[in-house]
Amino acid sequence: MESCLSVSSAPPPKKNIQEPVRPNANFHKSVWGDHFLKYASNPEQINDGVDKQHKQLKEELRKKLVVNVNIERAEEQLKLIDAIQRLGVAYHFRTEIASVLNNQLELWNNKVDDDDLYLTSLRFRLLRQQGYNVSCAVFEKFKNIDGRFNECLTDDVRGLLSLYESTHMRVHKEDILEEALEFTVAQLEQVIKSSLSDKVLLSQVVHALNIPIRKSLTRLEARYFISVYEQDKSCNETLLKFSKLDFNILQKLHQQEVADLTLWWKNLNVSEKVPYARDRLVECYFWALAEYFEPQYSRARKMSGKITALISLIDDTYDSYGTFEELALFTDAAQRWDINAIDQLPEYMRPIFRELIYLYNAMEEELLNDGISYRVEYAKQSVIQMITAYNDEAIWYHNNYVPTFEEYLKVALVSSGYRMLPTNSFVGMGKTEVPHQAFDWVSNNPLMVKASTIIARLDNDKVGHEHEQDRGHVASGVECYMKQHGATKEEAVVEFNKRISSAWKDINQECLHPLPVPMHLLERVLNLVRFVTLFYKNGDMYTNSNTHMKEFISSLLVESIPS
């Protein structure tokens, strides 16, 4: 009996458990590491003298803006508003600018510019930016009897540049602005080849052809334009001083914010716990900074930066590491949105899921006192929808399935993140700035959001599809379009560019009165589109963040502007 119950002391034979083969994305390490932690330990305070000077300069500029507009002063005020906006300080003067441009609308209606191409174009752009649906028919007067733009305009470089910038405000069926874009691009390219003697103007031409004002990030444009404006002999010295001062004051705030986020990220120990993913905390903060740089959005920026950083880890888990079975488990846990679901996850997924739940719980608690914690539920649902789309793509990849292009878009526009990001960007904004109905608007995929997802997705697919296919990835839009239509890669890109151009027109249309939601909310979506346009302009600058992206971040978060 005893021998029958005895247990052998020899260890049981080991099971031959084979580690799953995982793709190797081989992302480079963080460019910034702990660089910004120094701003947490030694925060720079704004001294009373600087603060006083800032207020004095602001008041001087305000007085210049509130003077009544007349025909004689119209050009001066238009130039002042344009400079204020491009220097990144318009947020101080929203009310005054709105009043001035309302008066400028009357001058527009009275057709006071005659044959001045520069002024006509400038007024058109500023009024369109303000949401006024002014007619582009005004540019007909610059055409000859053959219906072409007058050749004499080719000598007016400043006017051509102004017209070029105005064409980027076009909406659908504005053929004259399409013609103007083609005309001005051709002429301005000739200006570059001819080596214009006015080097400051030449610099602006090169800059504009690379990234027009409508598509530029406010903060980066400010950094660039300060260097241009100070070389302008007719510049407003008060405005120049104020812009430099304001830039540096805001930079100190932004440095402290990214320091806070770096400390949070360091405590998560991402580089060790999630070594397969892109370590891009500072780049994610830069993304949030693109959405809103103004001081009143500090809470929103930090929330948005954390959300984007976590979503980036989840994205890489689906694209670059997780097995089909593991991703199904994570999707189920996310859809349940229950911390207890963590027990079903592989060990490496648990820190990400835990922090995702904790982050949204913390946001909800922070907003509770303001009576706006309801916002977090909208944000959660947008994240769940995106993760579900990630999993749909994982199923396609697992089954070696290449969908039709339209079928692909139904999922890929959600997985782009640009349906989720606008909703989440609203969450941390002030109580009175985002009415409840704005969350219903943004979460129902309105035209503005739909257009932004098209731009984000197609820009991504154009520049990233070859690298993604090399490492093993679901078919991108390029492959789907090529297969369905028997097209070449070049033909697919041409079609994508057409759709991106059309989406920009949708965005411009949505920013004209009557507005679906307040302009400052539309600007959040617009800024996200501007960021993604920059993001993919020279390849994938997020994945490969050690070149252009590093330079952009350094110019805004490291290098101050000499006064």
UniProtKB/Swiss-Prot annotation:
Short sequence motif named DDXXD motif, residue ranges: 315-319
This protein's record includes keyword Nucleus: no
Alphabetical list of InterPro entries matching this protein: Isoprenoid_synthase_dom_sf (IPR008949), Terpene_cyclase-like_1_C (IPR034741), Terpene_cyclase_plant_C1 (IPR044814), Terpene_synth_N (IPR001906), Terpene_synth_N_sf (IPR036965), Terpene_synthase-like (IPR050148), Terpene_synthase_metal-bd (IPR005630), Terpenoid_cyclase/PrenylTrfase (IPR008930)
Gene3D superfamilies the record matches: Farnesyl Diphosphate Synthase, Terpene synthase, N-terminal domain
Residues reported to bind Mg(2+) 1: 315, 319
Tissue note: Predominantly expressed in root.
Region (Disordered): 1-22
A GO molecular function held by the record: germacrene-D synthase activity
Cofactor requirement: Mg(2+)
Catalyzed reactions: (2E,6E)-farnesyl diphosphate = germacrene C + diphosphate; (2E,6E)-farnesyl diphosphate = (-)-germacrene D + diphosphate
Top-rank EC class of the record's enzyme: lyase
EC number: 4.2.3.60, 4.2.3.75
Alphabetic keyword roster: Lyase, Magnesium, Metal-binding
Coiled coil stretches, renumbered: none
Annotated Mg(2+) 3 binding sites: 468
Record-listed Mg(2+) 2 binding positions: 315, 319
Cofactor note: Binds 3 Mg(2+) ions per subunit.
GO annotation terms (biological process): diterpenoid biosynthetic process
Function: Mediates formation of germacrene C and germacrene D using farnesyl diphosphate as substrate. Can also catalyze formation of trace of germacrene B.
Family: Belongs to the terpene synthase family.
Protein name per Swiss-Prot or TrEMBL: Germacrene C/D synthase
